[in-house]
C-alpha cells in the first residue's frame, strides 16, 4: 500500500522544484519571473505559452466552474477530486520525436520561436546572496506564508520558502530561492525554529503559525469583544415580527436566530449554517427586518458564484469579499453607520480578510454578520491560544432540520480560519 507516500507529495514537489530551479540557473543560466497566479516561470516564456501547455489544468478549471454554477456553491474537496478523475484523459503513447515536434509547433504559435527559445539561457549568474534573517522576517510577515491562511505545516513551509522572492544584489528583479533541495530543507527548519514562528501541535505533521498572525487574531478577538452589547443596529419588535410573518415557514430555531441577529445589539455576530439548513432563507428574513428599520443591508462571499446565490436568495446587493478588500480608502469606504454587511460561506474567509472587514466596520460604525459551515469547506481549525475573549458572544448553529442556538460563541477565528 503506497498511499502513505502521498503524505509527502507536497514537500517532495517543493524540493524537486527547488532543485530544478537551482540546476537550470547554475547550469544553463536561466532567469525567473513571477508566475501569473503564484510560483515562478522561466523569464522569457510568456503566460500565453504557459497556458498553451496547461490544457489539463484548464480542463479541470472549466469543469469545476460548470459544477459550481450548477450547484450554486463552491465545490467541496471530494467533488474536486471527482472532477480531477472524471476529466483525466486516456493514456496516449506518442513517440518522443513526435511529441517534441508538437511542443515546438505549439510554442511557436505563441511567439516562442527557436531564437527566443535559445535566448532563455546563457545569462551570467553572480550567485545569490541570501540574508537569512531578512528572509525569515519577510516570510513571516503579512505578505508571507500566512498571507492567505492562519496555520501551516512543514510541507507548506517548504513550498513557501521555495517560492518566496529573494531581492537581487544588483538591483534587478527578485528571484526565487536558488539553493537546491538540501539547502531548502536546512533553511526551512531554521525558519520553523526561529523567533518568528510558533509551533501549535506536536503531531506527526505539526502545525505552525507566525507571531504576526497571532497579532492579527488578537485584533479580531479584541474587536469582537469590544463590539459586544453596543446597541448596534437594533431592530424594533414590530419589524422583526413582520419579517417573521412574511417568512412563516422558518423553524422555531431559525426564528430565534433572526431575533438574535436583529436585537442583540452586537456589532459582530457569527452563525454556523450546516448544509441544507436554509441559511440564506434565514438571512433573507433578517434583511427584511433590517431594511424595514431603515438600515442598509449588503452581502458578500469569497467566491463569485456564492455571491450571486446570496443576492438571488435574499434580494440584497452583494459583492465579492475581494471587492470590499480593494475599497479600503478611508475617504470612500463602502460601509457606513447604517450598514449591516452579511458574509456568506464565512468559513472560506481568511482571518486576515476578516480583520480587514472588521476594521472597516469598526471605523464606519457598520455591523458585520458571518455565516458559514467549516465542515462543509474542509476548513483548518483556528489557532485558538488564549482567544477566550470572544467566547462571550453569540453563535447560532444551523442544522439541516433545525437551528440550534448556542449560548456562547466560539472565538470568531474558529468559524472562519
Annotate each language-model stretch with its function.
Residues 1-417:
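Conserved ATP-binding/catalytic motifs of P-loop helicase motor domains
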Amino acid at each position: 500500500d503506497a498511499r502513505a507516500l502521498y503524505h509527502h507529495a507536497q514537500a517532495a514537489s517543493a524540493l524537486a522544484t527547488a532543485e530544478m530551479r537551482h540546476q537550470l540557473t547554475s547550469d544553463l543560466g536561466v532567469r525567473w519571473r513571477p508566475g501569473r497566479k503564484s510560483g515562478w516561470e522561466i523569464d522569457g516564456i510568456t503566460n500565453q505559452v504557459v497556458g498553451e501547455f496547461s490544457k489539463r489544468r484548464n480542463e479541470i478549471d472549466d469543469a469545476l466552474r460548470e459544477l459550481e454554477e450548477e450547484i450554486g456553491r463552491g465545490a467541496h474537496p471530494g467533488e474536486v477530486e471527482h472532477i480531477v478523475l472524471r476529466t483525466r484523459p486516456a493514456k496516449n503513447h506518442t513517440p518522443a520525436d513526435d511529441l517534441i515536434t508538437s511542443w515546438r509547433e505549439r510554442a511557436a504559435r505563441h511567439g516562442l520561436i527557436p531564437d527566443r527559445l535559445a535566448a532563455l539561457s546563457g545569462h551570467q549568474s553572480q550567485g545569490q546572496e541570501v540574508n537569512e534573517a531578512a528572509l525569515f522576517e519577510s516570510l513571516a510577515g503579512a505578505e508571507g506564508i500566512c498571507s492567505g491562511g492562519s496555520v501551516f505545516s512543514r510541507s507548506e513551509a517548504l513550498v513557501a520558502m521555495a517560492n518566496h522572492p529573494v531581492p537581487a544584489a544588483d538591483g534587478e528583479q527578485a528571484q526565487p530561492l536558488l539553493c537546491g533541495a538540501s539547502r531548502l530543507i536546512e533553511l526551512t527548519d531554521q525558519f520553523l525554529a526561529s523567533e518568528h514562528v510558533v509551533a501549535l501541535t506536536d503531531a506527526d505533521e505539526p502545525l505552525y503559525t507566525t507571531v504576526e498572525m497571532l497579532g492579527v487574531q488578537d485584533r479580531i478577538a479584541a474587536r469582537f469583544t469590544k463590539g459586544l452589547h453596543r446597541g448596534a443596529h437594533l431592530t424594533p419588535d414590530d419589524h422583526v415580527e413582520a419579517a417573521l410573518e412574511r417568512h412563516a415557514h422558518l423553524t422555531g430555531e431559525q426564528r430565534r436566530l433572526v431575533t438574535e441577529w436583529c436585537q442583540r445589539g452586537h456589532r459582530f455576530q457569527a452563525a454556523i449554517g450546516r448544509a441544507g439548513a436554509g441559511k440564506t432563507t434565514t438571512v433573507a428574513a433578517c434583511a427584511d427586518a433590517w431594511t424595514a428599520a431603515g438600515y442598509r443591508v449588503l452581502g458578500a462571499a469569497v467566491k463569485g458564484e456564492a455571491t450571486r446565490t446570496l443576492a438571488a436568495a435574499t434580494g440584497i446587493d452583494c459583492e465579492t469579499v475581494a471587492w470590499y478588500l480593494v475599497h479600503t480608502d478611508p475617504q470612500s469606504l463602502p460601509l457606513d453607520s447604517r450598514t449591516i454587511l452579511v458574509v456568506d460561506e464565512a468559513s472560506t474567509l481568511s482571518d486576515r480578510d476578516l480583520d480587514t472587514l472588521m476594521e472597516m466596520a469598526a471605523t464606519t460604525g457598520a455591523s458585520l454578520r458571518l455565516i458559514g459551515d467549516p465542515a462543509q469547506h474542509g476548513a483548518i481549525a483556528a489557532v485558538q491560544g488564549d482567544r477566550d475573549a470572544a467566547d462571550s458572544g453569540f453563535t447560532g448553529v444551523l442544522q439541516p432540520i433545525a437551528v440550534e442556538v448556542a449560548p456562547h460563541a466560539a472565538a470568531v477565528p474558529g468559524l472562519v480560519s
